[in-house]
A protein has these predicted regions:
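Short, charged low-complexity intrinsically disordered segments located at boundaries
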Residues: 17-27, 162-167
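Ferredoxin-type iron-sulfur electron-transfer modules in oxidoreductases and energy-metabolism complexes
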Residues: 1, 44-167
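Secreted/processed peptides and extracellular or luminal domains of membrane proteins
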Residues: 14, 19-22, 39, 114-120, ...
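Glycine-rich phosphate/adenylate-binding loop and adjacent beta-alpha elements
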Residues: 20-43, 48
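A basic, amphipathic helix-loop patch mediating RNA/tRNA/ribosome contacts
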Residues: 1-21
C-alpha cells in the first residue's frame, strides 16, 4: 500500500494534500479528500505526487513533513496583548465588517497547496494569509510589525523559495 496523510475527510484540515496531474489537490477547487473519481474520465492516466518543496521533506511515499508551516505560524501567530481573562477578551468590540473580513482571511486551512503550486516553492501566500488574518482583529494590531518580521524570518529559515512574477 501507498502511504498518504489524512485527518478530517471533510476538506477542512488539508492533511490530505498531494499533487494530482501536476495540480495541488487536483483539478477541482477542493481538497484531495473531497475529490471524487467521477472528476476523471474512463481511461484517464492519473499521476499522484507528494508536495514539491525543499521545506516539505518526504517522509514516505505521499507523506511530507509540513512542520515548517507550523513553525511559521508559531513565529508570529500569537497575541500577547493583555485582554484580561477569556470572557474579557471576547468582550472586545469588533465591528461586523472587520469580523467578516477576518473570517474570510481565516479561510486558509494551512495545507501548503500554495507552496506546492508555486514554481519557486514560496510560502509568501501562506504567510501573508496568516498575517492578514491576525492583523484584521484589534487584539493583533499592537504587535503586527514584530509578527510580520518574525514570520518572514522563519519562512526564510525554513528554506522556502522567493516570490517572483511568473506569467
Amino acid at each position: 500500500p501507498i502511504a498518504f496523510d489524512s485527518d478530517c475527510r471533510e476538506g477542512i484540515c488539508g492533511q490530505c494534500g498531494i499533487v494530482i496531474n501536476g495540480i495541488a489537490h487536483g483539478p477541482e477547487v477542493t481538497t484531495t479528500c473531497q475529490l471524487h473519481m467521477r472528476t476523471f474520465h474512463d481511461g484517464d492516466v492519473i499521476t499522484i505526487e507528494p508536495w514539491r518543496a525543499e521545506a516539505f521533506p518526504i517522509i514516505k511515499d505521499l507523506v511530507v513533513n509540513r512542520s515548517a508551516l507550523d513553525r511559521i505560524v508559531q513565529a508570529g501567530g500569537y497575541i500577547s496583548v493583555n485582554t484580561g481573562a477569556a470572557p474579557d477578551a471576547n468582550g472586545t468590540p469588533v465591528p461586523k465588517q472587520d469580523a467578516d473580513r477576518a473570517f474570510e482571511a481565516a479561510a486558509c486551512i494551512g495545507c501548503g497547496a500554495c507552496v506546492a503550486a508555486c514554481p519557486n516553492a514560496s510560502a509568501m501566500l501562506f504567510t501573508s494569509a496568516k498575517v492578514t488574518h491576525l492583523h484584521l482583529l484589534p487584539q493583533g494590531k499592537p504587535e503586527n510589525y514584530r509578527r510580520v518580521v518574525n514570520m518572514l524570518n522563519q519562512m526564510d529559515e525554513e528554506g522556502f523559495g522567493s516570490c517572483t512574477n511568473i506569467g
